[in-house]
Amino acid sequence: MLLSVLLQAAAAGVGLSKLGAALGAGLAVIGAGIGIGKIGGSAMEGIARQPEASGDIRMNMIIAAALVEGVALLALVVCLLVLFL
């Protein structure tokens, strides 16, 4: 299936860089979603085990989620640059 997509892209004159940019953007979004899901799940588990530490756990969860989201945004920007330049 992937070979047929690559052959169609090559035949249509679309560069493989555009296909790679789309694939990279998709993988970046999927990775960020998985990462933020794991962060949230682990934070909820930690709060369930130690409710008195919920403030610290929540703060660390928000910082980690922001870092994961920042990396995903950077990956999307790089993919868009490859796509349009």
UniProtKB/Swiss-Prot annotation:
<dbReference type="GO" id="GO:0046933">
    <property type="term" value="F:proton-transporting ATP synthase activity, rotational mechanism"/>
</dbReference>
<dbReference type="InterPro" id="IPR000454">
    <property type="entry name" value="ATP_synth_F0_csu"/>
</dbReference>
<dbReference type="InterPro" id="IPR002379">
    <property type="entry name" value="ATPase_proteolipid_c-like_dom"/>
</dbReference>
<dbReference type="InterPro" id="IPR020537">
    <property type="entry name" value="ATP_synth_F0_csu_DDCD_BS"/>
</dbReference>
<keyword id="KW-0138">CF(0)</keyword>
<dbReference type="GO" id="GO:0005886">
    <property type="term" value="C:plasma membrane"/>
</dbReference>
<dbReference type="InterPro" id="IPR035921">
    <property type="entry name" value="F/V-ATP_Csub_sf"/>
</dbReference>
<comment type="function">
    <text>Key component of the F(0) channel; it plays a direct role in translocation across the membrane. A homomeric c-ring of between 10-14 subunits forms the central stalk rotor element with the F(1) delta and epsilon subunits.</text>
</comment>
<dbReference type="GO" id="GO:0033177">
    <property type="term" value="C:proton-transporting two-sector ATPase complex, proton-transporting domain"/>
</dbReference>
<comment type="similarity">
    <text>Belongs to the ATPase C chain family.</text>
</comment>
<keyword id="KW-0812">Transmembrane</keyword>
<dbReference type="GO" id="GO:0008289">
    <property type="term" value="F:lipid binding"/>
</dbReference>
<keyword id="KW-0406">Ion transport</keyword>
<dbReference type="InterPro" id="IPR038662">
    <property type="entry name" value="ATP_synth_F0_csu_sf"/>
</dbReference>
<keyword id="KW-1003">Cell membrane</keyword>
<dbReference type="InterPro" id="IPR005953">
    <property type="entry name" value="ATP_synth_csu_bac/chlpt"/>
</dbReference>
<keyword id="KW-0375">Hydrogen ion transport</keyword>
<keyword id="KW-0997">Cell inner membrane</keyword>
<keyword id="KW-1133">Transmembrane helix</keyword>
<keyword id="KW-0472">Membrane</keyword>
<protein>
    <recommendedName>
        <fullName>ATP synthase subunit c</fullName>
    </recommendedName>
</protein>
<keyword id="KW-0813">Transport</keyword>
<dbReference type="Pfam" id="PF00137">
    <property type="entry name" value="ATP-synt_C"/>
</dbReference>
<comment type="function">
    <text>F(1)F(0) ATP synthase produces ATP from ADP in the presence of a proton or sodium gradient. F-type ATPases consist of two structural domains, F(1) containing the extramembraneous catalytic core and F(0) containing the membrane proton channel, linked together by a central stalk and a peripheral stalk. During catalysis, ATP synthesis in the catalytic domain of F(1) is coupled via a rotary mechanism of the central stalk subunits to proton translocation.</text>
</comment>
<keyword id="KW-0446">Lipid-binding</keyword>
<feature type="transmembrane region" description="Helical">
    <location>
        <begin position="62"/>
        <end position="82"/>
    </location>
</feature>
<feature type="site" description="Reversibly protonated during proton transport">
    <location>
        <position position="69"/>
    </location>
</feature>
<comment type="subunit">
    <text>F-type ATPases have 2 components, F(1) - the catalytic core - and F(0) - the membrane proton channel. F(1) has five subunits: alpha(3), beta(3), gamma(1), delta(1), epsilon(1). F(0) has three main subunits: a(1), b(2) and c(10-14). The alpha and beta chains form an alternating ring which encloses part of the gamma chain. F(1) is attached to F(0) by a central stalk formed by the gamma and epsilon chains, while a peripheral stalk is formed by the delta and b chains.</text>
</comment>
<feature type="transmembrane region" description="Helical">
    <location>
        <begin position="19"/>
        <end position="39"/>
    </location>
</feature>
<keyword id="KW-0066">ATP synthesis</keyword>
<dbReference type="GO" id="GO:0045259">
    <property type="term" value="C:proton-transporting ATP synthase complex"/>
</dbReference>
